[in-house]
Amino acid sequence: KFPSVGDEINISRWEYFAHSMAKECGIDAAECKVVSSKDSRDVLLSKRFDRTENGKRIHMASSLTLLGLNDGDGESTGKGYLDIVDFIVANGSVDMEKELEELYRRVAFNICIGNTDDHFRNHAFLLKKDGWHLSPAYDMNPTNKYYHSLLIDGYTNESSLDVLYEAHESYMLDETTARGIIKDVTRNMRYWESMALRCGLSRSDLKNFQERIEDGMEWKCGSTLHR
């Protein structure tokens, strides 16, 4: 993925950070790295996850396709993450519980970093012998926005861990599991600055999203647990 001439921030390294941070938070994220082009620009390389070790194709489909939705469907049309939950329950693998926990963890992470370009095309599934599995997470980037492309629960797209926590039953998770996931994500997110520096960003770069990430990590329902 090549940067655009008009980019005001280092898009490649911020996306690399997002994927690296996601893994730190226990998320199955796509493998990627940053290399320098001949003109010294940072370029993000992402490893394909729809191929086997010997190059055989693994059938992949976006949630947009699998849900029979149209481009643009999302919070404005009353659609969101719970539609993906419904698909996992109806068509998922024998590891349905694991898939639901993974999705919930991804939503928590997206809230923390402000990954609000989380439309249905950015959530995909791989078809394996035992059914559909969430593909590794991909195309994640921090932003300074506070509203997601998809509804977090059945009513709002507000980027809030409290909204996500209150919706845990709709994600088919018990309270203990939901608390544990959010607690784990926020605990690991405390070290986001160190991760960003390791990913080649400067301390000056961190100011671009510092306030948004700190806001995203706020969790009133679990304040006594994760601080």
Spans of model-derived segments:
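Anionic ligand-binding catalytic core segments
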Residues: 1-227
